UniProtKB/Swiss-Prot annotation:
Belongs to the TRAFAC class translation factor GTPase superfamily. Classic translation factor GTPase family. EF-Tu/EF-1A subfamily. It is found in: Cytoplasm. GTP binds at residues 19-26, 81-85, 136-139. Its EC number is 3.6.5.3. Keywords: Cytoplasm, Elongation factor, GTP-binding, Hydrolase, Magnesium, Metal-binding, Nucleotide-binding, Protein biosynthesis. Transmembrane segments: none annotated. One of its GO terms (cellular component) is cytosol. It catalyses: GTP + H2O = GDP + phosphate + H(+). The keyword Metal-binding applies. Residues 174-176 are annotated as: G5. GTP hydrolase that promotes the GTP-dependent binding of aminoacyl-tRNA to the A-site of ribosomes during protein biosynthesis. This is Elongation factor Tu 1.
C-alpha cells in the first residue's frame, strides 16, 4: 500500500502539551487525536501509543518525544507530548519541537503544582508565544467554587510570567471521559471547545519564506573572474539577484550586493527559505566573510555579545560534564555554524550548576554574533557538547 501523499491544503501549526506530572497531558493528547479523528478524519491514537515515546537527538541531546497529528476544520496540527519532566526542559530549550502555542494541562483536583509554574516560566523564557489552558479532571471536582479558585490561581500564575492571564482561554473538561467517548459537557464537547480555542486563539504562524532574508554562512569560496561565493541554507525569506544585503557578526557589519544565486550548479534568479544556495557577492573579498556570520536583509538583525539565556546542562550519562561549573566558566557557544568563546555569570543565589540542571545565566561573548531572542545555541568544550541554550533577553 503506497503512503498517502501529504496534502497541505490547510495552514500548519505546531503545538504541544505542558504541565505537571500526572495532570493528564498524555491522556489529553490521546483524547484530542481520537475525538478530532472521529469528527474531521485522521488517525486516532491510544494512550499507550503516545506514552512510549521514541528517542530523538537534538543538538547531541537525547530526548523522548511523541508526535501526534490532527486536523480541525481549518487547520492541520502537529502536537508534541513528552513523557518526563526532564524531556520537557530539554525539548523546550533545544527547540527540538518549536511550539507556536502550548496547551497547559492543569488538574482541577490539585491546582497549579511546581512543574506547572516551571513549564510556564520555560515557555516564557524560550519564546512560546501563546498558552491555552485545559483544566483537566473536572469530573473529580463537584464544587463549582473550587473550580473557580483553581482557574483564578492559574490566571494569576500566567500573569506573573507575562502571559495575559485574564484573556487566556481556559477549557474545563475531563480528558479521560473524552477518550472514553463520553458525550457529557466534560467529555468530547470539551475537546471540541479546546480545538476551537486552538483555531481562534493561536494565530497562524508566519511562514519562514515570508520573514526577512537570513542565511548563516557555511562556506566561502573565491571563483577567479567571478568573485566570492558564500554558501549556506536560507533560514528565512527570499533573496533575489541584485538585492543589497548585510554581512553581520564577528566583525563590523558590511554591506554588499548579491550578483548571482546558484543552486545545484544552476543559476537562479532567487533563493528562498529551505534552499541550499551559493550567493555571489559583489566586491567582497574571500577574507571578508567567514563561518559564524550571517547574510541578511539590511537592518533586520543586529550583532550582540551580552545576553541572558535559559540553558540545560547535560548530565554525565548524556556525555556531558562529570563535575559542576561555577561563576565565570568560559566554554564555547556554538551559534548556527561556529563556536564563540564567552563567560557565564550565574544568578546570585546559585553557587554552581550541576550536570543535569537547567538554569538562567548571563553570557558575555568575546565576538558579536547576529542574534535575536529565541535563538538556540549549544555549549561546548573542545568540540564536545555539554549543554544547550536559548537566548532569553538581549542586553547589549
Amino acid at each position: 500500500m503506497a503512503k498517502g501523499k501529504f496534502e497541505r491544503t490547510k495552514p500548519h501549526v505546531n503545538v504541544g502539551t505542558i504541565g505537571h506530572v500526572d495532570h493528564g497531558k498524555t491522556t489529553l493528547t490521546a483524547a484530542i487525536a481520537t475525538v478530532l479523528a472521529k469528527k474531521f478524519g485522521g488517525e486516532a491514537k491510544g494512550y499507550d501509543q503516545i506514552d512510549n515515546a521514541p528517542e530523538e537527538k537534538a543538538r547531541g541531546i537525547t530526548i523522548n518525544t511523541s508526535h501526534v497529528e490532527y486536523e480541525t476544520a481549518t487547520r492541520h496540527y502537529a502536537h508534541v507530548d513528552c513523557p518526563g519532566h526532564a524531556d520537557y526542559v530539554k525539548n523546550m530549550i533545544t527547540g527540538a519541537a518549536q511550539m507556536d502555542g502550548a496547551i497547559l494541562v492543569c488538574s482541577a483536583a490539585d491546582g497549579p503544582m511546581p512543574q506547572t509554574r516551571e513549564h510556564i516560566l520555560l515557555a516564557r523564557q524560550v519564546g512560546v508565544p501563546y498558552i491555552i489552558v485545559f483544566l483537566n479532571k473536572c469530573d473529580m471536582v463537584d464544587d463549582e467554587e473550587l473550580l473557580e479558585l483553581v482557574e483564578m490561581e492559574v490566571r494569576e500564575l500566567l500573569d506573573k510570567y507575562d502571559f495575559p492571564g485574564d484573556d487566556t482561554p481556559i477549557i474545563r473538561g475531563s480528558a479521560k471521559l473524552a477518550l472514553e467517548g463520553d458525550q457529557s459537557d466534560k467529555g468530547e464537547p470539551a475537546i471540541l471547545r479546546l480545538a476551537e480555542a486552538l483555531d481562534t486563539y493561536i494565530p497562524t504562524p508566519e511562514r519562514a519564506v515570508d520573514g526577512a532574508f537570513l542565511m548563516p554562512v557555511e562556506d566561502v569560496f573565491s571563483i577567479s573572474g567571478r568573485g566570492t561565493v558564500v554558501t549556506g541554507r536560507v533560514e528565512r525569506g527570499i533573496i533575489k539577484v541584485g538585492e543589497e544585503i548585510e554581512i553581520v557578526g564577528i566583525r563590523d557589519t558590511q554591506k554588499t550586493t548579491v550578483t548571482g544565486v546558484e543552486m545545484f550548479r544552476k543559476l537562479l534568479d532567487q533563493g528562498q527559505a529551505g534552499d541550499n544556495v551559493g550567493l555571489l557577492l559583489r566586491g567582497t573579498k574571500r577574507e571578508d566573510v567567514e563561518r559564524g556570520q550571517v547574510l541578511c536583509k539590511p537592518g533586520s538583525i543586529k550583532p550582540h555579545t551580552h545576553f541572558t539565556a535559559e540553558v540545560y546542562v547535560l548530565s554525565k550519562d548524556e556525555g556531558g560534564r562529570h563535575t559542576p561549573f561555577f561563576n565565570n566558566y568560559r566554554p564555547q557557544f556554538y551559534f548556527r555554524t561556529t563556536d564563540v568563546t564567552g563567560s557565564i555569570e550565574l544568578p546570585a543565589d546559585k553557587e554552581m550548576v550541576m550536570p543535569g540542571d537547567n538554569v538562567s545565566i548571563t553570557v558575555k561573548l568575546i565576538n558579536p554574533i547576529a542574534m535575536e531572542e529565541g535563538l538556540r545555541f549549544a555549549i561546548r568544550e573542545g568540540g564536545r557538547t555539554v549543554g544547550a541554550g536559548v537566548v532569553a533577553k538581549i542586553i547589549a
